[in-house]
Amino acid sequence: MILVLAILATTVAALSVARPWEDIPPTMRGGEEPTETRSVSVDFGIVTDPDTDWSAIDENLDRVGANMVVLGAGRVEFTAFDWSSHPDAAAEPGADHIARAARALQETDDGSQRDFALLVDAYVPNWIAADPSVAGAEESGYRSTYQASAYQLARGEVGDRLVEYVVALGERYLPAQIAITELFLDHTAGPQDLQLFQEMTGAEDWPRAADGTIENNADVLRWRAEVITGLLRRMRAGLDEVRDGEGAAIELAMDVRVDWQDDPAAGALASGHDYAVLLRAADRLVVWAYPFERHSPAEIEGITSALRAAGEDMSRFTMSVGLWAQTSVDDEAISPDTLVRSVRAARTNGIRSVNVTPVSLMDDALWRALARVWGPQAR
């Protein structure tokens, strides 16, 4: 009897240290696709903070009827779990922050399974600091401190690493969705970018203005979108192979900017966000309908109206309402009234998926406001 108790005590002690069940990610997708998706984004800093009160977030998600959660999954150089291919990138070695968050938030108050999206940030500032040659460049010689070059995304190590990370997330978690954010092509005038432009378009040189400077005309803008689309196709192909084909069910989404003034349905062409081109590879576009206290709810509805008038499949768009008051690095939020009116405007003209971001700016007044438009009493 003493021996049995000793063995039992040893086993319990070992389990309490190892906790193997915590190494197994929870289910991150429900059964049938919901008729309406109400998602809230949890920023990477909240996901990786050991002091995050997940029970409070879960209660608030129930309060507003959120049936999907978008978890920040980090960057290829700063990950939310131990990535075996690049262990030095872990935000906290030995910790799986994504699994911890999903485990805490996976069930609604009625026992339903929430869907999860994992958000991959395409910025590579540390990589650029170590090797400036991978950065997007201007004709003037300016190099971006965050964005990789077009060549790197299409043919280089940065693009390869992004694809590898997306596939690793799919393999480990099998979420409902993997979304890519901060994937812009604003700086594409490097010498390797020119080689790529020549290869992809057959042109001998950049289009140039009368003074000889590069002219970012329609050909260049479309090429930028084709570069991003090529990267998305590689991600899609990689996901399709995950777990002997199970990964084909993972939706591939991409965050996109908005052209508020000229043609909202076309996209932010200067950033490479030509919606029609991107939708050849992405399953869904997440449109940044961020008020920033300078865009009215009527303007948000103007985007959905333009998309519908253009004949777009509205089921392939999510309208994302950002809480930042001025800029996306602002720590001040829009008012509860602006949130209510913006969320209502976002769900117009056939849009069935609306997102609110980020959770770090949500206070009690904003949660109460969101419950007015999303909560059980509002449906």
Where are the regions a protein language model picked out?
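Substrate-binding cleft of secreted/luminal carbohydrate-active enzymes
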Residues: 68, 281-300, 313-379
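Aromatic- and acidic-residue-enriched segments that line the glycan-binding/catalytic groove
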Residues: 84-90, 124-147, 182-211
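Aromatic-lined carbohydrate-recognition surfaces of secreted/lumenal glycan-active proteins
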Residues: 41, 115-123, 179-186, 214-270, ...
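Catalytic domains of carbohydrate-active enzymes, especially glycoside hydrolases
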Residues: 53-79, 171-177, 277-286, 346-354
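Active-site-adjacent "subsite" loops/lids of carbohydrate-active enzymes
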Residues: 33-37, 48, 115-172, 210, ...
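An active-site-proximal structural segment forming one wall of the substrate-binding cleft
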Residues: 60, 149-185, 231, 274-278, ...
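Aromatic-lined substrate-binding rim segments of carbohydrate-active enzymes
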Residues: 57-58, 62, 74-128, 215-245
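Aromatic- and acid-rich polysaccharide-binding/catalytic face
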Residues: 78, 176, 181, 198-217, ...
